């Protein structure tokens, strides 16, 4: 509806029709008893109004060292684990770590929640970080029965917006242009 505030903003930016939203994540890098309770309350409220959306839960942020360290082992701690359909895992680590994780998802238990790698950042110099990212992505693709979703990070950095070693906008975007990074071709 372009008569609403955000519908008008969307139309002003060249998209009068609504986007076909399928997924929504509840939180970002939230976990623990308070999150598990709040997830259920938010899930119940949203799913009552928008039953066709798929809701994504967050995983604990912990250092992962072993291939069989399935972050989804915390799902039973949610108030109602059956309401956790997709589980978001974030990974930031070294090139060496990424290469060691090539078989990581082979040992994930099946029949739990679907897998979403919402953030993957491999530290290191190009092209080695690109190749190491490929090792993780091959593991994700090889385990397609986990119904994996994947989001690459970083998308683009605008180096003119670096202030006191803090990245401000992480994305360069516009309705009239796009830039494909080397990660796009991986």
Where are these regions (language model features)?
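N-terminal catalytic cores of secreted or lumenal carbohydrate-active enzymes
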Residues: 1-75, 81-85
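Catalytic-core region of carbohydrate-active enzymes that cleave or remodel glycosidic bonds
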Residues: 44-45, 51-55, 76-81, 85-186
């Amino acid at each position: 509806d372009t008569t609403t505030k955000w519908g008008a903003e969307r139309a002003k930016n060249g998209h009068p029709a609504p986007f076909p939203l399928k997924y929504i994540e509840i939180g970002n890098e939230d976990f623990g008893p308070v999150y598990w309770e709040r997830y259920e309350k938010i899930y119940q409220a949203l799913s009552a109004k928008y039953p066709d959306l798929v809701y994504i839960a967050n995983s604990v942020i912990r250092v992962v060292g072993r291939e069989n360290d399935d972050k989804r082992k915390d799902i039973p701690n949610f108030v109602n684990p059956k309401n956790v359909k997709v589980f978001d895992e974030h990974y930031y680590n070294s090139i060496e770590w990424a290469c060691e994780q090539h078989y990581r998802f082979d040992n994930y238990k099946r029949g739990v929640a679907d897998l979403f790698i919402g953030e993957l950042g491999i530290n290191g110099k190009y092209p080695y970080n690109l190749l190491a990212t490929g090792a993780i992505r091959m593991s994700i693709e090889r385990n397609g029965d986990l119904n994996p979703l994947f989001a690459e990070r970083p998308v683009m950095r605008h180096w003119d917006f670096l202030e006191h070693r803090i990245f401000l906008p992480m994305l360069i975007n516009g309705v009239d242009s796009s830039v494909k990074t080397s990660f796009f071709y991986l």
